[in-house]
Swiss-Prot record:
<feature type="binding site">
    <location>
        <position position="305"/>
    </location>
    <ligand>
        <name>[4Fe-4S] cluster</name>
    </ligand>
</feature>
<comment type="pathway">
    <text>Isoprenoid biosynthesis; isopentenyl diphosphate biosynthesis via DXP pathway; isopentenyl diphosphate from 1-deoxy-D-xylulose 5-phosphate: step 5/6.</text>
</comment>
<dbReference type="GO" id="GO:0016114">
    <property type="term" value="P:terpenoid biosynthetic process"/>
</dbReference>
<comment type="similarity">
    <text>Belongs to the IspG family.</text>
</comment>
<keyword id="KW-0411">Iron-sulfur</keyword>
<dbReference type="InterPro" id="IPR004588">
    <property type="entry name" value="IspG_bac-typ"/>
</dbReference>
<dbReference type="GO" id="GO:0005506">
    <property type="term" value="F:iron ion binding"/>
</dbReference>
<dbReference type="GO" id="GO:0051539">
    <property type="term" value="F:4 iron, 4 sulfur cluster binding"/>
</dbReference>
<dbReference type="GO" id="GO:0046429">
    <property type="term" value="F:4-hydroxy-3-methylbut-2-en-1-yl diphosphate synthase activity (ferredoxin)"/>
</dbReference>
<protein>
    <recommendedName>
        <fullName>4-hydroxy-3-methylbut-2-en-1-yl diphosphate synthase (flavodoxin)</fullName>
        <ecNumber>1.17.7.3</ecNumber>
    </recommendedName>
</protein>
<keyword id="KW-0004">4Fe-4S</keyword>
<feature type="binding site">
    <location>
        <position position="270"/>
    </location>
    <ligand>
        <name>[4Fe-4S] cluster</name>
    </ligand>
</feature>
<keyword id="KW-0408">Iron</keyword>
<keyword id="KW-0560">Oxidoreductase</keyword>
<keyword id="KW-0414">Isoprene biosynthesis</keyword>
<feature type="binding site">
    <location>
        <position position="273"/>
    </location>
    <ligand>
        <name>[4Fe-4S] cluster</name>
    </ligand>
</feature>
<dbReference type="InterPro" id="IPR011005">
    <property type="entry name" value="Dihydropteroate_synth-like_sf"/>
</dbReference>
Amino acid sequence: MYNESPIIRRPSTRIYVGDVPIGDGAPIAVQSMTNTRTTDVEATVAQIRALENVGADIVRVSVPTMDAAEAFKVIKQQTKVPLVADIHFDYRIALKVAEYGVDCLRINPGNIGNEERIRSVVECARDKNIPIRIGVNGGSLEKDLMDKYKEPTPQALLESAMRHVDILDRLNFDQFKVSVKASDVFLAVESYRLLAKQIKQPLHLGITEAGGARAGAVKSAVGLGMLLAEGIGDTLRISLAADPVEEIKVGFDILKSLRIRSRGINFIACPSCSRQEFDVIATVNELERRLEDVVTPMDVSIIGCVVNGPGEALVSDIGLTGGNRKSGYYDDGVRQKERFDNEHIVDQLEAKIRAKVASVDARIPTTDITE
């Protein structure tokens, strides 16, 4: 099957966010961010667990106040996934959450303060073996850079990132990753391209403030897809004005489409037409809902007629080709004698998929099947 990604990843150094490896060929980590009030511990913990259930490798939590920092301490104790504390304006909050076991500190160089304050955060991170993400954003560039460039440009984002990379270099601190996010696709893509040529540290990708669920997913897929196809990127976050759980799903779908990292069922399904012998759209929607718990990578083709069905089935782990009253079933590209009753196709196909998943899982020697 033609399912190996031709993408050659950009070489980068290795850091760890908790127990999650970042860079140097590690699987691209998918993360999201909570949108609850951090001081609402119960709601925040519930959302973090929901994100973890759909595969989040890392979760970022905004910590805007000292009260939020105290809440973060409790949240950290009640969750398992590595947590990144998002810090703006007050560097002392970064020092506080470091005491509470944060797995990574995200600071925005445009508003965290002067170099001495950054130095305090860096020394604390070094002492506690905590990595840092330098988060540059086109919407919060330093005033002098806006005066110089008049508007966010790739060169402005690069200069902002590099001045803070230089600070970390002078402090002999190399456990960091960098992001240069923007809401404009071309601005973000070119900024990342420039940065990728300047440093060896891992890059965290994102199109910031991308929009609602549909438009934001499309914008992120276009922008991040361009970078990932060039081998750029070690972690990613899809920024949607939607349920954060959707960010994780979209993130994995982007990686899955590029054959970089697969998680769960990859459905190959026709848009359907008058030739379909069963309701393709309803079948796919129901199977997606039922099989959300599956993490084992698997290609399943569901085609409503014999025009493209056999060809797609040949390169799928499981294939279904629409037929009159009964549809053809393929396993590993081989047509089986068994045929599926079109009226009960969802139940029959779900059973076959789950049986094959169980068979594959039994052969996998590692517990991390997503890598």
